[in-house]
Amino acid sequence: MKKLIMTLIVFLCTTSVYSQITAIHFNAAWNEPNKAEWVGELTDCEITYVDITASPKLQQKYNVVVVPTIIVLKDGEEIKRWQADLSFKIIATRKDIQNEIDEIIMSDF
């Protein structure tokens, strides 16, 4: 019974940490070939995709000036941002962004 309770406590603690982290992937329909498909493979965070042509208010709110842009938030506040270069391709890798997410999680312990 003690082991079950400890497992539940660990699960609840880690679930609450993960739910506080969000990765937002901004892109546009006209830039679909440069979409960072691997964003959906990120773990331990919520993932949101925003098409700036369909959601200009979100583009403005997050001050997105180039696509794709990936923003990692914790508790709604921006922690890190990766933006495309002049060719509209993002240079960051899935590993770069996952490492940042992992660091955010570890900083809470």
Can you say where each PLM-predicted feature lies in the sequence?
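Local sequence-structure signature of Cys/Sec-based thiol-disulfide redox active-site neighborhoods
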Residues: 18-48
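Soluble periplasmic/extracytoplasmic beta-strand elements of cell-envelope proteins
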Residues: 23-25, 69-71, 81
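Extracytoplasmic/secreted cell-surface and envelope-processing proteins
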Residues: 33-35, 58, 82
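N-terminal post-signal-peptidase region of extra-cytosolic proteins
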Residues: 52-57
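Structural micro-motif
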Residues: 62-72
